[in-house]
Amino acid sequence: MLRVLDEVTILKRMLLLLVILFSGIFAFSQPFPTCDVRAYGAKGDGVTLDTVAVSQAIAACVKQGGGTVYFGPGRYVIGTVELYSHIHLYLDSGAVLAGSHNIADYLPSPPFGFARHYGVDVTGEGALLGMLIAKNADDVSIDGTGEINGEDAAFMAEKSAHDSKDYDERFVRNPEKYQAAMNELEYGPIEPQGRPGTMIVFFHCSNVKLHGIRLASAPNWTVHMQNVEGAAISDIEIFNDPRVPNNDGIDCMQCQHVRITNSNIHAGDDGLAIVRSEDVNVSNCSISSRSAAIRLESTRRSTFTGLSMDTNRGIAVFGDDFPGQQNRPTEDVTFSDIVIRTHLIPGGWWGKAEPIYIAVQPCAAEVVCGVRVRNVVFNNITAEAEGGALLLGAKGAPLTGVELNDVRLHMIVPDPAISESVGGNLDLRWTALTPRDGVVKSDIPALLAEDVNGLRLRNVQVDWADGMPDYFSDGIRVENFKDLLIDSYSGRQAQPDRGAAIDLRHGAGVSITNSRAMPGTRTFLQLDQVQDRRVFVNYDLRSAASVITPATQRFETEIGVPAVQRK
C-alpha cells in the first residue's frame, strides 16, 4: 500500500513539473505585441506631425517588454523618434516615414552623447539628430516594404554650389577651368542650408537589423552605426539625390560583426564608409556614388565580395591617425569579384575616377609613423576607368603587403569637356596636410604606386582606348619601393611617343616574370635608380620597340633580351 501511495505521489509530482514546464514554455513563446501607430493617434496624412503618436506607440510596446510598431499605408511626418531594446519597426507596403521640414522638430544630439565624427564634439548641423536614433539598445530592427524619406529638398539651396575649397587652384591643371567646374550644378554638390543630422542612428547598440525597406532622399548621412556589435543589413535600397553632399549610404564606425548583403545603394557621397571597425562583410551589393563607392579607414579583418560599382572613385582605403586615439592600421582586408565603372566628374567631390585608391597621411618631419595599411588584397577586379588606380604610402609609413591579383584596368576616354577642366590631377584630399597638396597637376599612369613594400601584382592587365587625353602616361609606375613582384602582366603605355609599359623608380628588389608587351609598346621597362634587380624571365616582348631603358640596366637572372632592344 505504501509503495502504491509513493508511486501516486511521484506521478502527481511529475505531472506538476510538466505543467510548470509547459506553462513556462508557453509564456516564453508568447509573441511580443504589435502596436499600430494609428491606434495611438498617428494620422499618416502627410501633413500632421506624428512624432508624439509614434513615440507613444513605441512606449506602449516597451512597457510590454518590446514588440512590433506597425505602420500601415500612409505618409507619417516625424521629427526625431527614439528606439529602444526589442523594438521592431515594421513599415507595410505604402507606408512612408517622412522627415519634417521644420528643423525645430529634430532633437539636439549632445543630450544623447552622440557626435557624428569619430567621437569628437561637433557643432552646427552635426549637433542635430535626424529621424530615428537608438542608443544603448539591443535587438532593434526596421523591416518591411515601406520607405523612410528624409525630404532632402527642403534643406538644400539647389541653385548654389557647395565648394569646400580644400585645394589650392594655383597647383591644379588649367586653374581657371578647374575653378569653373567647381561651381557647376549639374553634378553637385549643391549647398545645404540648416539640415538635420544623420537620418537613422544606432549608437552603442547590439543585434541591429535592417531588412527590405527603402531609404530615400537623406539630407545628411543615411544610416550611421557607431559602437555597434552585431548588425545585419539585407535586401534594402538606398536612393539619395547624387547632388547632395554628405548623404553617405551606410557608415559604420567602431563596429564589429557587421553583415551587409543583397542591397542597392545610390548616394551622392560615399556609398559605404567603414571606419575603425572589425569583421565587416559586404556581399552582393550594387553601389553608385559621386564620391567613393566604398571608403575604408583603420579597419581590419573584413571582406567585400560580389559587388558592382558605378562611381567617381571606386574602392578607397585609408590609413590615418585620429587625434587622441591610438593609431590602428587598415589590415587583413580582401576585395574580391568586383566590377567597377568610374567617371571623371566636375564639382567638389573627392576623387578623380580612380578604380582603386589607397593613401595614408604623410608623417610629421623626422617621424616614422609605422605601417598604416598592410595585407590589403584585391582579387578578380574588372575596372572600366576614366582615371588611374593609386597606391600611395608615405615616407616612414609605406603600404605593406598589398596585392592585386587578376585585375584588369580598361582605361577609357572621359568626356572631353570634363577632362579639359578637371582631368590630369591627383586628388590627395583627406590625406593632404595642406590645401597646397590637396589637388595637384600630374600625369596619370593606369596604376601608380609610391612608398610600397612587398607589393604583388599578379595577372594585372592594362589596356587603353584610342585617343586618350595627353595627361595619361605609363601602364604601371612604381616609385620608392622594396621587394616588388610583377608576374603575368600585360600592357603598354597610353601615348605612342612617350611613357613605358612599366616604369620603376627609386627602389630595391624587383622580379618581373611571365609578362607581355601589348602591341604599340614603346618601352616595356624603364628603370631609374633601381637596385637589386633580381629576375626578368619568361616574357613575350615582341611588340616592344624597346625592352629595357637604359640599356646598361641588367637583372641577376635575365634570359634572352636582345641587345637591339636595349636603348
For each predicted feature, which ranges?
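Extracellular/periplasmic carbohydrate-active domains that bind, remodel
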Residues: 28-567
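Positively charged n-region of N-terminal signal peptides that target proteins for export
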Residues: 2-3, 7-14
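Intrinsic disorder/low-complexity segments in short proteins, especially the signal peptide
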Residues: 7-10, 22-23, 375
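Bacterial N-terminal signal peptides
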Residues: 14-27
